[in-house]
Each structure stands twice: as structure tokens, then as C-alpha cells.
Amino acid sequence: FKLASRRRLYNARVLQADNIGDKQRNPDVDAARQNTQIVVVGAGLPGLSAAQHLLYNGFRRTVILEATDRYGGRINTQRFGDTYCELGAKWVKIDGSQDSMYELLRNTEGLDKQIKQPDRATYLQDGSHINPAMVELIDTLFRQLCRGFKVSERVKTGGDLHSLDNVMNYFRTESDRIIGTSFQQPKDQLAAREIFQSLFKEFGSILGCCLEYVNIEHITKCPVQQELRPLYVPTGLDNVVDDLIQNMDKAQLQTGKPVGQIQWTPAPMKSVGCLDGSLYNADHIICTLPLGVLKSFAGVLFRPTLPLDKMLAIRNLGFGNPLKIYLSYKKPIGRWLKGSLRPLGTLLNPSAEQQPERNWTQQVVEISQVPSSQHVLEVHVGGGYYEEIEKLPDDELLEQITGLLRRCVSNNLVPYPQELLRSNWSTSACYLGGRPYFSTINSARDVQRLAAPLGEKSPGLLFAGDATSLNGFGTIDAARSSGIREAQRIIDFYLKRAHFG
């Protein structure tokens, strides 16, 4: 891959020949590389990673079919105001593991990468600042809860198992216990409770759902915690995606190809049919469709219908919708915003007479300036109002968020934004959501069932995506590594067949 990054003028086929030229030759493996037809459904990070790994290893008859007119999936960078904004994934965990997103980013040459700088938000309650020492203490305690602190102990002793019904019950029970033992004054207890509530909403904003829907197993098997010092790409994470496809030609990466049917049996030849009437025969099919699409269309998309255990896994797993909102202003925002803000209490709900459609502002977690920008704000939203916010008219959303900003900084002259940019993952037919989570009716076994390949003699239908890996479940690391995992499964099949006959 490093060779490919350095020699951008080489075409894909020359590179592929070079990559396998020094490996031990086997006629059967060479024939497989030349003749095996592999169709990858979806050009998100799992699909691109799978195809790149197959092409790198000489499997030249690999094609990606992407329904939309763009590749990258939920890595989606938009130029907005004076900066680049991410509508999907933004942060890259610093992780030296093989096949991680960090490894891919590190190997992408000539790309500016920066570490997120510490930015302690100011918590605002009734127009006054919360003591930073209290905030730091509660933040530390909450991070322990996010790691499943005392969950195993509770299970062993059998005490208050009702609080383990879902993540929100667990958070509320443990935070109430902490507040009762750590803070004596009613004023401090109220402030602590509101800080905890803000952190609960932040946790929900990562998954894109109400925490009442999330299984406690999610935080014990797949901890959800934002990195303190992750990497980001100021010019957009989609630069990394561009690097992935630099050696693919138009025949190998085809956009505007929504798939209508996946015929995965009988052996040996399978096929993928597109809505435009085109048909692609395949020896192996790697399905990287988002979980939201599988939930809605798996029953009609696959022929024959998928086995019951896989259909149940698709049904049981939760699929949330993390929302991104960006606001662009004509003049520098530093004139009235001096740092990131986290509004609490009456700032979020100043009047009981608020109209119901304005309630979404109560779910605002943080308002912050986008790094490297002087004109763009990002609004972080928690809770379960994502679909409603996506459908809210621009003028209503701008009026409501401006009202909140004016209350936060006690300045009625805060201007209205010039432009608004927001994600629409839940209402996009090709995604129908943004991130998987463990629902209260599923377990880790559902992830394993979803990831299991189908096929009697060979892995004919394979599944990749961020919902198919417990390691990094729901993250871009899981998306990338799962694509490579399934590509390697195909490669290993032919290597073993050539070796053992």
C-alpha cells in the first residue's frame, strides 16, 4: 500500500502484478486471482477496504457496486463556510493495530493530520459558570461508568439487577448513588445531576439514540468512549477515502448502481442484480450494506431469504442516527463566543409554555467552534429527536438555536447564521441511520451471527461493516477491519484449497 501511495502514476494492474510478483507462485492460486469474480455491494469504508485488499492481492475481477453517486459511505466531508465539516465520522483513534483507520491515515502521504487539542467546555447553569473542579470530578466518575464500572460486581451479588435493564437505568442509578455520597448541599446536588444529564446526552449523541434502548452489554463488551486526543484531518477525512480508490478504475468502482437483488445460491455461480437492469455474476459477494438498509430490505433483497438466525440478528441489533449540525456566520464568532459551551437547566428549558416542536433544543449537549475555523459552529445534540430535527425547516431550526445561543452568552445581538449544514442519515434511503448499537433485545452473539459467511463449500455471501465486529463495534475502525477480514477470508479459501487440494 505504501508503494501505491508513493507511485501515483502507476496504474492499478501494474501495481497488482508487482505486489504478487515476488510471492511463491502456485498455478491454482494464480488461476483464482485471474478468474474469480467478486462483487462488493457498497462503496463505504468496508467495501472500499475489502476491494482494495483483494486487488492488492491480485484478485483483478473485483467490482464495487455503489447505489449513490459518491463513494465513502458515512465518511462525508463538505466544504462549508471557511472550513471543512464532517457529516459522518470525524475522529481517528490513535491505534497501531493492523488494519486500523490510524494505520491507513498514517500511510496516506502528504496529508495534514492534527491531534485534537484539549478544550474544556464551560458548563452554564442559570447564567453562571459551574465550578470546573466539580465538572472534572464528575467527568472522571462518568468515564468509569462508561467502562462498565461495578456492573460485573452487581451481577455477581445479584443486587438491584433492574438498574441493568438498559444503559440509562444503570447511569441514573449509579449517578444518584455518587451524588448522594459526594455532594451534601442541595445546590451542589442539583448542579451535579445536571452535569451528569449532559454527559448522558453526550453518550447518546455518539450512538444516536435514547439510552433506554441500549443494552448494558454494549458498555461491557464494546465500550463507548470518546478518545481524549484523537486525530483529525483539517481538510477532510474523505482524503483518506480518495487514497483508497486511487488505483481503482471505473470498471472496478461503479457508482449509481443501486442493488435490487442478491442471488447467493445455488452454487457455483451467484449474481447481483441492479435496479437499472444490469446483472453481475459472482463467485463471492461481499455485502457491506448499512444495518438500517438490511433492517428494511433484507427480506426482499436476498434470494433465497437469509437464514433465520441472521435475519434475527439484523432485527435485534439497534441502529441509531448521530446528528451533525453546523452553522456558518458572516463575521468571526470569536466576538461573542469565547469557548465551548454546555447549557444546563433553565437555559435549555426557560419556559414551561414552550411549543412541543421547540423541545429538541433541550437535547443540545455542546456548542463549539470548529477547529481551524473562525466562522463555523458545531452543535452537538443528544437524545432521540434526530429524525424530527432532520425534518425541521431551516428557518425554525435557526431561530431556535439562535435563541439558545443568546441565552447562553446573555447577548440578544448574537446574529443569525448565514448558512446551515446538517446530516440526514436517518432519512436517506441508502443509509436509514448512522451507527449500530446493542439494543435491549440483542447480545454479542448477534454481531457474530451477522458476520458469519454463508455458503456450503465456499464463502459465497460474506458480510462486512461496523455492525459485524465486536472489536471497535460501530466505529470506522470496525468498518475498515471488517472489510479486510472478509477479503482475506476469500484469499485464504483459495490458498487453503491450493495447498490441501
UniProtKB/Swiss-Prot annotation:
Keywords: Cytoplasm
Record's keyword annotation contains Cytoplasm: yes
Top-level taxon in the UniProt lineage: Eukaryota
Any GO MF annotation of the entry: polyamine oxidase activity
Keyword Transferase: no
GO terms under cellular component: cytoplasm
Subcellular localization: Cytoplasm
Coiled-coil ranges from the UniProt annotation: none
Any Pfam family matching the protein: Amino_oxidase
Purpose of the protein: Has a non-vital function.
Protein name: Protein anon-37Cs
Species in which this protein is naturally found: Drosophila simulans (Fruit fly)
